[in-house]
Amino acid sequence: YFLNVCTFGCTTPYWDWERWEKEIDRMALYGVNMPLATVASEAIAERVWLRMGLNKEEIREFFTAPAHLPWHRMGNLNKWDGPLSDAWQQNQIALQHQILTRMRELGMQPIAPAFAGFVPEGFVQKHPDTQFRHMRWGGFDEEYNAYVLPPDSPFFEEIGKLFVEE
């Protein structure tokens, strides 16, 4: 595949459609056929967490600022410099639709993320009988560390299906 997850924090988080279109066209020129497509992942996650009974505040405090989203997606970091605004989420959805359309027009198979097991603290609080692992990373205070749902939890498959549906 093309691009690495950190590119979406270090390089692309504030790109507009014009910049993305140039990059996608360049990918096609070089024969890239499996580019990562992680734009709007948090908007999809927000829909899933709403369906799982969390409110917007519980969900929004989970996300980092745009430049830190790759580390959030990898389960390293939550909340840092967040939250994301409604306008950001809506713009990212529209941008991702343009990105996916262009990639497919050029014969690419975009690689979109699915559920990796990282859950908002609000989900942990709503399910006290479920075992979660509280991760540590990079010396950040505990409040910024991720919770991981074990893959053998019945919630894991349910949430995973919702991510694919959304």
Predicted regions and their residues:
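Aromatic-lined carbohydrate-binding surfaces of glycoside hydrolases
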Residues: 2-166
